[in-house]
From Swiss-Prot:
InterPro entries: MOB_kinase_act_fam, MOB_kinase_act_sf. Interacts with orb6. The keyword Ribonucleoprotein does not apply. The gene is mob2. This is Maintenance of ploidy protein mob2. Its main location: cytoplasm.
Amino acid sequence: MFLLNSLSRITRGNRSKRHQNLSDASSSSGSFSKKSSTSQLVRTGSPSVEPTALYLQQPFVRTHLVKGNFSTIVSLPRFVDLDEWVALNVYELFTYLNHFYDVFATFCTVKTCPVMSAAANFDYTWLDNNRKPVHLPAPQYIEYVLAWIENRLHDQNVFPTKAGLPFPSNFLVIVKAIYKQMFRIFAHMYYAHYAEILHLSLEAHWNSFFAHFIAFGKEFQLLDKRDTAPLKDLIVVLENQGNI
């Protein structure tokens, strides 16, 4: 909660415009049908030696708002239903990510990010209604993802909030799809906008948030290694530092 509250002053000025965009995106024809809500990872070009990413350099990589290992706070408490615990945490993590993107939306534009990239040779494509992969500017891709997730979170058939409504039998499968898309936003922000994160002095918040996100994903096996490839080096560092 402290993490979310500490962002409130920064996001207040940006939220109105971005949530209008989110509303427009979620109501666009066919954009968020079950058929078109997936996307693909595309490796572009040939492997090459890249300079060390800014987010992997000292002192930034060891800068955290929260000290200690997040595994202690993500594990399932006794007597708590697994689906309830996962639903609560995914909802909160999505809320935090939404607030962070309110800040970053100013920097993530069609001009600065014409494709949704996560590394020099990693681009994400969106699958349209005909299952055809299409390249989208990063802000459009992210708006689509956020709106799609928000629709899922407010679907009583997927995330029930009323007494007596059960979780669907494929609930964890749905959550994995949501988690994968959330990871892609993290990957793009680390790759394309870490300089802006530093400029806003948000690296401690962002690094701790990512460590929390990864720790929860590992605890409940919500991410595959293939999905986390763009940030695998950072995840190894976080493991070695005892953050996750």
